[in-house]
Amino acid sequence: MGKPVVAIVGRPNVGKSTIFNRIAGERISIVEDTPGVTRDRIYSSAEWLNYDFNLIDTGGIDIGDEPFLAQIRQQAEIAMDEADVIIFMVNGREGVTAADEEVAKILYRTKKPVVLAVNKLDNTEMRANIYDFYSLGFGEPYPISGTHGLGLGDLLDAVAEHFKNIPETKYNEEVIQFCLIGRPNVGKSSLVNAMLGEERVIVSNVAGTTRDAVDTSFTYNQQEFVIVDTAGMRKKGKVYETTEKYSVLRALKAIDRSEVVAVVLDGEEGIIEQDKRIAGYAHEAGKAVVIVVNKWDAVDKDESTMKEFEENIRDHFQFLDYAPILFMSALTKKRIHTLMPAIIKASENHSLRVQTNVLNDVIMDAVAMNPTPTHNGSRLKIYYATQVSVKPPSFVVFVNDPELMHFSYERFLENRIRDAFGFEGTPIKIFARARK
């Protein structure tokens, strides 16, 4: 199943971003920045009581020049659409306001669990008026202080209680789950329709749903597939659903539930920052990735156009140097037939295990070719390596001192492993560990 999604909702200036940073900040600070990946602080991974979950700060959703109450309304509705649990945050020093009651009215309509957090209660004396917040109708209010981190444990305990009740859609291990992501109007739905119209594709049914995310199940060459959240690709109409961050949010949920991610670019419009942002999430989540350039039929081209476009992609997506690039047209169906084989290959490589003895031969040959680096008179010594997991393939290299493993040498080892075993379409991870 995908990770549960928790949204923090409330009127401006109640401390949503402070709480977001409190819950997610420690996690964010230990994640190494990936070159070329643009981070968006609206959305972050977090962990509590052995639950991994995704956290949304709806205050980071820019609705534009909408009137004040309309902004609050739209942010709350985004949370109701996308979250599994909602943290409704109010300012304990100001008491219940008309704007709080406005948010409460919107949240009454949701069937999602709502946990009420009363922020800015920095000491015991300030908590005397907490009972006023029962009037909002969401049960026990949890007193917290974002500034000092007080009360967050109790709040997160209450949130985590609801995780066990979240419905999930389970598929067999053999089923390949993938999604098509990209900004609005790049042609994701058209690509799906073109794919499902191929001769060898048998669409069997619409699979079970997780909330409103309808998945499409089909068989291709006797292999079962699920396209995650085909409903999300087609969902249009409301004002906020056309905002960049809403579409990013929807894409992140689909990425989370997929093994392979097809990043769809617009051949006519080229690459924009949002493309990099969404692709960066797929990479950081360790998913297999295929890059699809759609609308290639509409591009004026000569014999060098495709090569130049590919070089431009490699330049913008340096962190996806392992991902194959496919050029196609959903409209004319030209080269549509290349997509499914690329997804299958990426999935196979995402799950690929290599023999330990062969891996160590590759590592030792690499060291012989390019001796290990030294630092302050100490030389890195590599003893042996082993693959510890798949999805994505992950390797531990046992060394004398992990601090001596410079990222450039780690990158060199990754390239040698790729040369030996392929791994096209999937990231691989390498960790240096001290031999005990």
Swiss-Prot record:
Residues 4-167, 176-351 form the EngA-type G domain. It comes from the Bacteria. GTP 2 binds at residues 182-189, 229-233, 294-297. GO terms for molecular function: GTP binding; ribosome binding. One of its GO terms (biological process) is ribosome biogenesis. Keywords: GTP-binding, Nucleotide-binding, Repeat, Ribosome biogenesis. Coiled coil: none annotated. Residues 352-436 form the KH-like domain. SUPFAM superfamilies: P-loop containing nucleoside triphosphate hydrolases. Disruption phenotype: Essential for growth, it cannot be disrupted. Depletion experiments show that cells become longer and abnormally curved, with nucleoid condensation. Cells have many fewer 70S ribosomes; the large ribosomal subunit is 45S and is missing proteins L16, L27, L36 and interacts with 2 large non-ribosomal proteins. GTP 1 binds at residues 10-17, 57-61, 119-122. PROSITE patterns: G_ENGA. HAMAP family: GTPase_Der. Estimated to be present at 7000 copies per cell. GTPase that plays an essential role in the late steps of ribosome biogenesis. Belongs to the TRAFAC class TrmE-Era-EngA-EngB-Septin-like GTPase superfamily. EngA (Der) GTPase family. Cofractionates with the 70S ribosome; association is stabilized by the non-hydrolyzable GTP analog GMPPNP, and inhibited by GTP or GDP. NCBIfam families: GTPase_EngA, small_GTP. This is GTPase Der. The gene is der.
